[in-house]
């Protein structure tokens, strides 16, 4: 598992609202996302399909099952050619104007069993999320 945390200059309520918005609009939060399709949505989960273009890598189609409870959103990839993956997004109250944002990524290569350890991926996603929340 790799994780990264940073502080958003926003209330917990604002961060949480952006986390929920991210379910339907990941392109504002995750680098390299395109062709987003919400395949199913109910009170318990969302099934989302999209393409992700990794930096200097191939474009991959992924299908995710997304669940959310305050203040945690879990993105579990249920269709990916190379990896088994789940990513957790956490929001933690710091003060009325600051919230700790943490992403934890559990990526495992299906063929080799090797865990993904590229911390730049998760750091870039957290920083892009915070920049969007803060309006940059």
Regions found by a protein language model. Give the residues of each.
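A short, structured loop/turn motif at beta-sheet edges
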Residues: 12, 39-44, 67-69, 92-100
